[in-house]
Amino acid sequence: MRLALLCGLLLAGITATQGGLLNLNKMVTHMTGKKAFFSYWPYGCHCGLGGKGQPKDATDWCCQKHDCCYAHLKIDGCKSLTDNYKYSISQGTIQCSDNGSWCERQLCACDKEVALCLKQNLDSYNKRLRYYWRPRCKGKTPAC
């Protein structure tokens, strides 16, 4: 379902300045130096849309926590893939704008948290977990 939504959004011609998913991509790319879409989507059992099972490493744990953050926002009616927000990065510090809706500010906070987590855990990044086969993700998914 989420993949179909993402494909639909991309086919609809969303530009690089629209939507939370694209903000997330730019924020992670800036903080990690890795092209987020190509390095983290998918990665392990939790990076990318959805996630299940035990996270494979510290990088994957960042994504699992991010999934939980988005899940809480969804309960509150936020649209994590399409809500747009404003932010800036100065000297390696992400500053979410105080402008925008509550959902937009919270979405920025979720994305900021994962971008910083991924940066702090760059040493755990394992290329073998890139395109990890999700059916191999076993065990109980950590609770949010």
From Swiss-Prot:
Upon changing H66A, the result is: Has no effect on Treg effector functions
Which reaction does this enzyme catalyse, per its entry?
Answer: a 1,2-diacyl-sn-glycero-3-phosphoethanolamine + H2O = a 1-acyl-sn-glycero-3-phosphoethanolamine + a fatty acid + H(+); 1-hexadecanoyl-2-(9Z-octadecenoyl)-sn-glycero-3-phosphoethanolamine + H2O = 1-hexadecanoyl-sn-glycero-3-phosphoethanolamine + (9Z)-octadecenoate + H(+); 1-hexadecanoyl-2-(9Z,12Z-octadecadienoyl)-sn-glycero-3-phosphoethanolamine + H2O = 1-hexadecanoyl-sn-glycero-3-phosphoethanolamine + (9Z,12Z)-octadecadienoate + H(+); 1,2-dihexadecanoyl-sn-glycero-3-phospho-(1'-sn-glycerol) + H2O = 1-hexadecanoyl-sn-glycero-3-phospho-(1'-sn-glycerol) + hexadecanoate + H(+)
Annotated Ca(2+) binding lies at H46, G48, G50, D67
Q: Name one GO molecular function term.
A: calcium ion binding
Q: In which tissues is it expressed?
A: Highly expressed in secondary lymphoid tissues, spleen and lymph nodes. Expressed at a lesser extent in thymus. Expressed in CD4-positive, IL2RA/CD25-positive, FOXP3-positive Tregs (at protein level). Expressed in myeloid cell subsets resident in spleen and lymph nodes, ITGAX/CD11C-positive dendritic cells and macrophages (at protein level). Enriched in CD4-positive, ITGAM/CD11B-positive dendritic cell subset. Expressed in pulmonary ITGAX/CD11C-positive dendritic cell subset (at protein level).
Q: Which Pfam families match?
A: Phospholip_A2_1 (PF00068)
Q: So which domain of life are we looking at?
A: Eukaryota
| Annotated keywords | Calcium, Cell membrane, Cytoplasm, Disulfide bond, Glycoprotein, Hydrolase, Inflammatory response, Lipid metabolism, Membrane, Metal-binding, Phospholipid metabolism, Secreted, Signal
Identify the glycosylated residues: N99
The record's InterPro entries line, in alphabetical order, gives: PLipase_A2, PLipase_A2_Asp_AS, PLipase_A2_dom, PLipase_A2_dom_sf, PLipase_A2_His_AS
Q: Which CDD domains does the record associate with it?
A: PLA2c
Names of required cofactors: Ca(2+)
Supply the EC number(s). 3.1.1.4
Phenotype reported upon loss of the gene: Knockout mice are born at the expected Mendelian rate and have normal embryonic and postnatal development. They are susceptible to acute and chronic inflammatory reactions and resistant to tumorigenesis. In a model of hapten-induced contact hypersensitivity, mutant mice show an enhanced T-helper 1 immune response in skin lymph nodes at sensitization phase followed by delayed inflammation resolution with more severe ear swelling, epidermal hyperplasia, and inflammatory cell infiltration at elicitation phase.
What pairs make up the disulfide bonds? C45-C137, C47-C63, C62-C117, C68-C144, C69-C110, C78-C103, C96-C108
Q: What does the note accompanying the cofactor annotation read?
A: Binds 1 Ca(2+) ion per subunit.
Active-site feature positions: H66, D111
The UniProt similarity line reads: Belongs to the phospholipase A2 family.
Role of this protein = Secretory calcium-dependent phospholipase A2 that primarily targets extracellular lipids, exerting anti-inflammatory and immunosuppressive functions. Hydrolyzes the ester bond of the fatty acyl group attached at sn-2 position of phospholipids (phospholipase A2 activity) with preference for phosphatidylethanolamines and phosphatidylglycerols over phosphatidylcholines.
Q: What is this protein called?
A: Group IID secretory phospholipase A2
Name of the gene: Pla2g2d
